[in-house]
Amino acid sequence: MELKNYQIQVISDLERFLELLIEKQSISSAYSTLWNEKGVNVGIDGMPPYKTELAGVPQVCFKVPTGGGKTFLAANSIKPIFDSMPHIHPKAVVWLVPSDAILTQTYRTLTDKNHDYRKKIDVDFGNKVEIYSKQQLLNGQNFNPTSVSDNLSVFVLSYDSFRTSKKDGRKAYQENGSLLPFVRFKQDSGSLLEDTDETALIQVIRKLNPVVIVDDERVIIRTKLEKPSKI
């Protein structure tokens, strides 16, 4: 499966934005420069200025019509993003979806090595790819510091995965002996939640400082998982 011409342009724009981000060390400047290069003003008479939702966290939104291939675009975006990061950064991705139905579909698609989306990711990362459901993460099923260091790790989760109002969501914040090996995993101490055990899944994910792919940004509900990767 190949990218269509407009999808190629989208990925090209993403790559250019990442280049500008490294060059200028300013999200808003990179954003404005990208649009200016296209002959589009940023401000009152043009595109709205960059809006910061999370301080220091670059955000990119692909606006794609229904059937426009947003999932394939997301799959093609992972490599350019990590290529722009220091190589020591763990290659971890939270693939966040809005509903259980989409969760099941996305997990099935990404774990199917014959599917075009998974094939693309495998090619980009030399077949060193692990896809995890929430239950697999909670169980520590092939999820450990060695695996995370050696592979691209994709966590397919829903908003409900972190809602403390739901019993299943609270599991992500509970002490978890299966994730004990991650206690020794180096991290930015400022990324951890207070009053939450260090072995909790939410703490492990925050340590990894993942890239977050949001499926359908219109319905995103912010949770405590609000420190996606700083590029």
Question: What spans do the regions from the language model cover?
Answer:
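RecA-like P-loop NTPase motor core of helicase/translocase proteins
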Residues: M1-I231
